[in-house]
Structure formats: structure tokens, C-alpha cells
């Protein structure tokens, strides 16, 4: 268990397309109750996803954000760094109105909750996704 009773770990990912490259930033936010937070992040880039007709494949790009988020969370659990109850996964998918990310809400929420994680969606107060978005802007 975490040494700090009020510590929660928020993990979220955002992406941005620049030219023919997709940049993914996954942020891990250490939230100390009402006493502030800090974060670390990883940044990777891959070639832009395309459909068979050469149009951008937005679904694959957005789904990969959930995959990166879960990979980091599982790494932290598998290596006994944190416990699941300390972790909140954030998915930057809109559950309040219809957008390109809306179809991913069920898939991402299902993957995460079936593994026992707590989640936040775009309509919730997110820290990790906002931090990741901020870093994405400089990619």
C-alpha cells in the first residue's frame, strides 16, 4: 500500500498528429489529497494510422491512448510499485455528447473496470489527461 494515505495515482494519455506522425504522451500524476500534485510522463511517436482508403484512422489512434494508459497501470501493479486501489485511470473520451471518441467509452471503461481499476472520463475532473494534453502541444 502507498506510504501516503492520501496519495492517488492518476494515469492518462493524450495524442496529437503532427505531419505523418502520431505523438502519444502518457502522464502519471501523483496527487497528495489537497496538498498538491506532480507528474511524470512518457512520450512516444509512431507513424500516423491510415485506413485502407488512406484516410486517417482516428479510432485506432484514440484506442491506443487507452492501451498505453492500461500498460502503465499494469506495469505499476505488476512490479508492486502501487496497488490498484491507489490508481485512477483517466480516458479522454467524451461520455456527455457525441464526438469521435464517444464509441470508445464502453471499450475503454470495460477493459479497465474488468481489471479492477477505477476510471474517470472526459466529463470528470481529469489531471493526467490534462497534463498529457499540455505536453502534446509542444510535440
Predicted features and spans:
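Catalytic phosphate/metal-binding cores of nucleic-acid and nucleotide-processing enzymes, i.e., regions
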Residues: 49-59, 111-116, 133, 137-138
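A short acidic-Thr-Gly-centered motif at the start of a beta-strand
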Residues: 1-5
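Acidic, metal-ligating active-site segments
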Residues: 11-12, 16-43
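Short, low-complexity, polybasic intrinsically disordered segments
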Residues: 91-127
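Short acidic, S/G/P-rich loop/turn micro-motifs used as interaction or catalytic elements
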Residues: 16-19, 35-36, 60, 67, ...
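Short glycine-rich phosphate-binding loop at a beta-alpha junction
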Residues: 8-10, 85-93
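Acidic helix/loop or adjacent segment enriched in Glu/Asp that either coordinates divalent metal
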Residues: 46-81
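C-terminal edge-of-domain segments
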Residues: 23-25, 119-139
Amino acid at each position: 500500500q502507498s506510504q501516503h494515505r492520501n496519495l492517488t495515482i492518476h494515469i492518462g494519455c493524450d495524442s496529437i498528429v503532427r505531419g505523418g506522425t502520431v505523438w502519444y504522451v502518457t502522464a502519471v500524476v501523483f496527487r497528495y489529497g489537497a496538498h498538491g500534485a506532480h507528474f511524470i510522463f512518457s512520450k512516444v511517436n509512431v507513424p500516423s494510422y491510415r485506413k485502407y482508403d488512406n484516410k486517417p484512422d482516428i479510432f485506432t489512434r484514440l484506442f491506443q491512448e487507452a492501451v498505453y494508459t492500461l500498460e502503465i497501470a499494469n506495469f505499476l501493479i505488476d512490479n508492486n510499485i502501487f496497488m490498484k486501489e491507489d490508481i485512477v485511470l483517466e480516458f479522454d473520451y467524451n461520455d456527455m455528447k457525441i464526438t469521435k471518441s464517444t464509441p470508445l467509452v464502453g471499450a475503454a471503461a470495460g477493459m479497465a473496470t474488468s481489471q479492477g481499476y477505477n476510471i474517470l472520463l472526459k466529463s470528470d475532473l481529469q489531471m493526467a489527461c490534462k497534463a498529457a494534453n499540455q505536453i502534446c502541444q509542444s510535440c
